[in-house]
Amino acid sequence: MAEEGIAAGGVMDVNTALQEVLKTALIHDGLARGIREAAKALDKRQAHLCVLASNCDEPMYVKLVEALLAEHQINLIKVDDNKKLGEWVGLCKIDREGKPRKVVGCSCVVVKDYGKESQAKDVIEEYFKCKK
């Protein structure tokens, strides 16, 4: 029992916590994937968190998203690869071995609903508190 608590309650880094939060939000239908859905969610102030890919090849996307985030004081996390982000938010097929294939790149994701309280959500919120 104690070992299980350490495994589950060990120190979680921000990337792992982000993956967990995105997965939970996806299950509870709380994600806006892609620039159009993300911009609509940000404009309606439904967003809790925004994730943007650093390798987004359209500078106007980045400008639009960052402007909306600044206007509504919404937190931003940048990830290095849009393919990785696409995989995290379910924009891929999973083969028999459980490996993702046909991954579609996703440059912007907005979390509208965390789904449920979790340690990962707390890690993300703590990360933003420390950042300010």
UniProtKB/Swiss-Prot annotation:
Entry-annotated residues carrying N6-succinyllysine: 129
Role summary: Part of the small subunit (SSU) processome, first precursor of the small eukaryotic ribosomal subunit. During the assembly of the SSU processome in the nucleolus, many ribosome biogenesis factors, an RNA chaperone and ribosomal proteins associate with the nascent pre-rRNA and work in concert to generate RNA folding, modifications, rearrangements and cleavage as well as targeted degradation of pre-ribosomal RNA by the RNA exosome. Subunit of the 40S ribosomal complex.
Origin: domain of life: Eukaryota
GO CC entries: cytosolic large ribosomal subunit; cytosolic ribosome; cytosolic small ribosomal subunit; nucleolus; small-subunit processome; synapse
Record-linked InterPro entries: Ribosomal_eL30-like_sf, Ribosomal_eL8/eL30/eS12/Gad45, Ribosomal_eS12, Ribosomal_eS12_CS
Stored PROSITE patterns: RIBOSOMAL_S12E
Keyword Acetylation: yes
Transmembrane regions: none
A GO molecular function held by the record: structural constituent of ribosome
Family annotation (SUPFAM superfamilies): L30e-like
Record-level GO BP terms: maintenance of translational fidelity; positive regulation of canonical Wnt signaling pathway; ribosomal small subunit biogenesis
Coiled coil regions, renumbered to chain: none
N-acetylalanine modification, residue list: 2
Keywords assigned: Acetylation, Nucleus, Ribonucleoprotein, Ribosomal protein
Subcellular location: Nucleus, Nucleolus
Protein name, as recorded: Small ribosomal subunit protein eS12
Gene3D superfamilies: 3.30.1330.30
Family as reported in the entry's similarity comment: Belongs to the eukaryotic ribosomal protein eS12 family.
Quaternary context: Part of the small subunit (SSU) processome, composed of more than 70 proteins and the RNA chaperone small nucleolar RNA (snoRNA) U3. Subunit of the 40S ribosomal complex.
